A protein has these predicted regions:
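Glycine- and acidic-residue-biased ligand/ion/polar-headgroup-sensing regions
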Residues: 36-55, 146-166
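A short glycine-rich, His/Asp/Glu-containing loop-to-beta-strand
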Residues: 6-32, 36-44, 92, 112-152, ...
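Flexible, surface-exposed loop/linker segments and immediately adjacent secondary-structure boundaries
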Residues: 74, 85-90, 94-110, 114-116, ...
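Extended, hydrophobic interaction surfaces within ordered domains
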Residues: 49-99
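Ligand-binding loop in jelly-roll beta-barrel domains
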Residues: 73-95, 148, 157, 183-204
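Short acidic-glycine-tyrosine-enriched beta hairpin
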Residues: 12-16, 55-73, 166-185
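Short beta-strand segments in beta-sandwich/barrel cores
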Residues: 30, 47-51, 68, 140-141, ...
Length: 204
């Protein structure tokens, strides 16, 4: 989180988002800086950090493995990693303001057709963030995403067999923290080769 992004840390960059995969070293401290963009943070490992803002506020943060958080941009601060081990974090920077359009959720919305395994982690004017749980070799119900675009990030290495309406079936292999970009509405379903959780960030 505090390391200066190297070119190979940028895993996805388009008109909508820039996604960074960062490995923070123990005891890392940053100079005074700000993040211009609002971000969705996905913690792949436990983290204990302290943020010291220019206005004097001190914010001690404790994050669990797999936790997801909203991080608004704009405030000048320094950061310090209090951990004695490395920690991986995925940062999804949002490049655009909300579209202002009503968020579309139809009858086949994943939260409706698979409510046991798909939960809304949080939602605001910019995003709806879903936590999707897959059992090994169990196909999820066919469902639809009607929003403009989305980023999917697995919390573990996984192979997914994906069935998409109007397209050929395909197999997708993703490493933990590797983002996958999808644009436009889609009707699909997936089956994972292992028990896994995926974080889906739907853009508004």
């Amino acid at each position: 989180m505090f390391a200066q992004p190297a070119p190979d840390s940028v895993k996805l960059d388009n008109d909508f988002v820039r996604v960074l995969f960062l490995t923070d070293q123990p005891g890392t401290k940053t100079p005074l800086h700000r993040h211009e963009s609002n971000r969705v943070m996905i913690y792949l490992d436990p983290m204990e950090i302290v943020l010291r803002y220019q206005d004097g506020e001190v914010d001690h943060q404790h994050w669990r493995k797999g936790q997801v958080a909203w991080s608004p941009g704009g405030r000048l601060h320094t950061g310090e990693n209090l951990m004695d081990r490395t920690a991986r974090v995925v940062e999804v920077e949002l490049k655009k303001p909300p579209s202002g359009k009503p968020f579309a959720a139809g009858s086949r919305d994943p939260v409706k057709v698979n409510s046991k395994n798909v939960k809304v982690e949080f939602e605001n004017d910019y995003v709806r963030v879903l936590r999707c749980k897959y059992a090994a070799n169990v196909r999820e119900p066919l469902h639809e995403h009607l929003n403009e675009a989305r980023v999917t990030v697995p919390l573990h290495d996984v192979e997914l067999k994906v069935t998409t309406a109007g397209a050929q079936d395909r197999t997708v292999t993703l490493a933990a923290g590797q983002p996958s970009w999808s644009a436009g509405p889609v009707v699909h379903a997936a089956q994972a080769n292992r028990t896994v959780e995926l974080i889906v960030i739907e853009l508004k």
